[in-house]
Amino acid sequence: MHCPFCAAVDTKVIDSRLVGDGSQVRRRRQCLECHERFTTFEMAELVMPRVIKSDDIREPFDEEKLRRGMQKALEKRPVSSDDVEMAISYIKSQLRATGEREVPSKMIGNLVMDELKKLDKVAYIRFASVYRSFEDIREFGEEIARLQG
């Protein structure tokens, strides 16, 4: 790593420590030229797969879009924001775990439905009604019956 003080190429690591939950490493470095010390933080860059929409258009994964969709389904429901964030993290880890560069949007929708089903049944029905384009009350009833059965 280049020294931020003199731009020298050679620096050495003096100390390394895990930060927080262990997903980040704090390194204390010293420049071999000017001998100044500085701190860096290192973490793995995890690339999310691209999303293949139903019309075959590809777009980058949008975590905010995922969050908005879940929050809309969970509106005025007794679910903590921590639980929502944990569900989002789980969905993202499942998508990365596929090892694929691209995933169909349908897979994301199914993962969201699975997580909402665990968090809140009403939110699950709300999301499913839009995601599966329920046409009438009968389809709502069938989905509710599946939940209860």
UniProtKB/Swiss-Prot annotation:
Annotated zinc fingers (unnamed), start-end: 3-34
Gene Ontology molecular function, alphabetical: ATP binding; DNA binding; zinc ion binding
Cofactor or coenzyme needed: Zn(2+)
Bound cofactor: record note: Binds 1 zinc ion.
Keywords from the UniProt entry: ATP-binding, DNA-binding, Metal-binding, Nucleotide-binding, Repressor, Transcription, Transcription regulation, Zinc, Zinc-finger
Domain ATP-cone: 49-139
Pfam families with a match to the protein in the record: ATP-cone, Zn_ribbon_NrdR
Keyword Nucleotide-binding: yes
InterPro entries cross-referenced by the UniProt entry: ATP-cone_dom, NrdR-like_N, RNR_NrdR-like
GO terms under biological process: negative regulation of DNA-templated transcription
NCBIfam families noted in UniProt: transcriptional regulator NrdR
Family designation: Belongs to the NrdR family.
Functional description taken from the UniProt entry: Negatively regulates transcription of bacterial ribonucleotide reductase nrd genes and operons by binding to NrdR-boxes.
HAMAP family for the chain: NrdR
Stated name of the protein: Transcriptional repressor NrdR
Organism this protein belongs to: Photorhabdus laumondii subsp. laumondii (strain DSM 15139 / CIP 105565 / TT01)
